[in-house]
Amino acid sequence: MLLVIDVGNTNTVIGVYHDGELEYHWRIETSRHKTEDEFGMLLRSLFEHSGLMFEQIEGIIISSVVPPIMFSLERMCTKYFHIEPQVVGPGMKTGLNIKYDNPKEVGADRIVNAVAAIQQYGAPLIVVDFGTATTYCYIDENKQYMGGAIAPGITISTEALYSRAAKLPRIEIARPDNIIGKNTVSAMQSGILFGYVGQVEGIVKRMKWQATQEPKVIATGGLASLIANESDCIDIVDPFLTLKGLEIIYERNRVGHV
């Protein structure tokens, strides 16, 4: 079995693959202050609840956009699993040709998503990841990573609104009954959701203008389904795209792989 760990700024998603299939998955809050023992105890609890044992894990791969957490995670892997984890970064074989001014600037999450999307859906592609930041990645018909856009995520945009406006409350991110809000909460929900849908449609449309062939649009991340339900510009929602990319990259880098 393969343990895959995707560390985001807000959430960490953990999965277990068996024979190329995602068998188990969990989402936890990202904590920059957990020790290797706290991570180990947390994983032991998740494993025991699912009837898994640490001894069943034969490999581990991690992608992270939060560098401070990596020391504890790597120590946890060696202490509790007795495995040196693969870590997505420079020097790994991803099979991705990155046409960025400085390829090292491309986040691990964006690389992993692109690798999975190309293998699953072909190219050209636009991959939209609704995370703490919303990222847009364009892959051309030659499977080259050409670049993209980074925007504030819907959650931090919402937090900025109520934290900077004294009379506006903290609200749930949800679809209002009507775009024309009849109270403060529904008006905020309307502005946030439909404003964000407009952002997605606008950026995707402009990327398509520059594409030489019509790209397929793949969405992932916690709020992908909410946005996709309000827009016809998203072709496919794949909630486990990042985990699949980690599994693919692990296979490309494991000892003995040709």
From Swiss-Prot:
A monovalent cation. Ammonium or potassium. Pfam families: Pan_kinase. K(+) binds at D129. The active site is at D109. Pathway: Cofactor biosynthesis; coenzyme A biosynthesis; CoA from (R)-pantothenate: step 1/5. InterPro entries: ATPase_NBD, Type_III_PanK. One of its GO terms (cellular component) is cytoplasm. The keyword Nucleotide-binding applies. GO terms for biological process: coenzyme A biosynthetic process. One of its GO terms (molecular function) is pantothenate kinase activity. It is an enzyme of class 2 (transferase). Keywords: ATP-binding, Coenzyme A biosynthesis, Cytoplasm, Kinase, Metal-binding, Nucleotide-binding, Potassium, Transferase. Substrate binds at Y100, G107, A108, D109, R110, T184. Its cofactor is NH4(+); K(+). Its main location: cytoplasm. Its EC number is 2.7.1.33. The keyword DNA damage does not apply. Homodimer. Belongs to the type III pantothenate kinase family. PANTHER family: TYPE III PANTOTHENATE KINASE. Catalyzes the phosphorylation of pantothenate (Pan), the first step in CoA biosynthesis. This is Type III pantothenate kinase. It comes from Bacillus velezensis (strain DSM 23117 / BGSC 10A6 / LMG 26770 / FZB42) (Bacillus amyloliquefaciens subsp. plantarum). The gene is coaX.
